Swiss-Prot record:
It comes from the Bacteria. Its EC number is 2.1.1.166. It is an enzyme of class 2 (transferase). One of its GO terms (cellular component) is cytoplasm. The gene is rlmE. Coiled coil: none annotated. It catalyses: uridine(2552) in 23S rRNA + S-adenosyl-L-methionine = 2'-O-methyluridine(2552) in 23S rRNA + S-adenosyl-L-homocysteine + H(+). S-adenosyl-L-methionine binds at G60, W62, D92, D108, D133. It comes from Burkholderia thailandensis (strain ATCC 700388 / DSM 13276 / CCUG 48851 / CIP 106301 / E264). The active site is at K173. This is Ribosomal RNA large subunit methyltransferase E. It holds the Pfam family FtsJ. Belongs to the class I-like SAM-binding methyltransferase superfamily. RNA methyltransferase RlmE family. The keyword Methyltransferase applies.
Amino acid sequence: MAKNRFNQSWLHDHINDPYVKMAQREGYRARAAYKLKEIDEQDKLIRPGQVIVDLGAAPGSWSQYARNKLAQGRRRDAVREGGIDGTIIALDMLPMEPIADVHFIQGDFREETVLHQLEEVLAGRSVDLVISDMAPNLSGVAVADAARIEHVCDLALEFAQNHLKPDGALLVKCFHGSGYSQIVEKFKHQFKTVAPRKPKASRDKSSETFILGRHLKLPR
C-alpha cells in the first residue's frame, strides 16, 4: 500500500512538473535537458566549434540541448557537420533514438571496440567538454550506493583525463551523502577549478547535484 501511495505521489508530481511540460512542448526527451541548460547558461560551457562527449547519453536530452546550442552558434564560414558548428558524440550501453548531427556509439566506453569507434570520430582531436548524467541503480543501502556513485564518477574522471584538452571541462551528476566529499576531493586532485552545481530543475526532494571541473592539473 505504501509503495502504491509513493508511485501515485511520484506520478502526480511528474505530470504537474513544469519542466516535464516544457520538455514535451520544446521536444526534449527528458526534463534533464533543463539541468544542463541552467548550468550552461551560468558557466558558458558549450561554445561553437567544440568537441563534446556525452557519457551515458540515453535517452538523449543532454545531447539534444548541446546540439541545439551548437546549431544556434553556427557561423557561416564554419567547417561543420550537418547543421552544427562542432562535434557531439553520445555514448551509452543502452540504445538511443537518433539525434540529427549527433554521433551515437552504443557500448561500454571502457571497451576497446567502443574506444576505437570513438577515436575514429575524433580523428585525432581532443575533447573540449565531457558531460555525464550517468547514475547507477541505487539499492537504498547507503554504503553500497555510495560505492556505486563513486564508481560512476571515477569512470567519468578517467575518461576525461584520457580525452580532454588541458583547458577542457567535465560535468558529472553526483548525489549528496556518504562518499560525496571523497568525490569532490578526486575532482580537486584532477582539476584546477571545481564547483558544485544544483540547478533549479533538480527536484527539491532529490539529493542530486552536479560537479563541474575545469582545466586539468596534469594534462595527459
